[in-house]
Design a protein with these regions (language model features):
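Formylglycine-dependent sulfatase
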Residues: 1-104
Length: 104
């Protein structure tokens, strides 16, 4: 990666709440997330969060930067369904790769 480019770390999870992250619950709940806590201690804790109505819609919105309605992914899709990302829909990975980022 070229010098001067910021690191981008995405942590995406499914079906958790703020109290599942120990940096937020500060020992009140049972689960521990030491690696996320380490990141939080050197940065910032967010107080607001937003989500789509389903995990599929949330992933589609993040991957494409578009409202899930535009790409037809409002709820969990089924194998063989017509809805889904099309070749014309660029993804965040496709847009970052030409700028020197390693993407998966």
């Amino acid at each position: 990666m070229p010098q001067g480019k910021p690191n981008i770390l995405v942590i995406m999870s499914d079906d958790i709440g703020i109290w599942n992250i120990s940096a937020y619950h500060r020992g009140i709940m049972g689960g521990q997330t030491p690696n996320i806590d380490l990141i939080a201690s050197g940065g910032a804790l967010f107080t607001d969060s937003y989500a789509q109505q389903s995990c599929t819609a949330g992933r589609a919105a993040f991957i494409t930067g578009q409202h899930p309605f535009r790409v037809g992914l409002l709820k969990v899709g089924m194998p063989g369904a017509k809805q889904g990302l099309q070749d014309k829909d660029p993804t965040i990975a496709e847009l970052l790769k030409p700028h020197g980022y390693a993407t998966a």
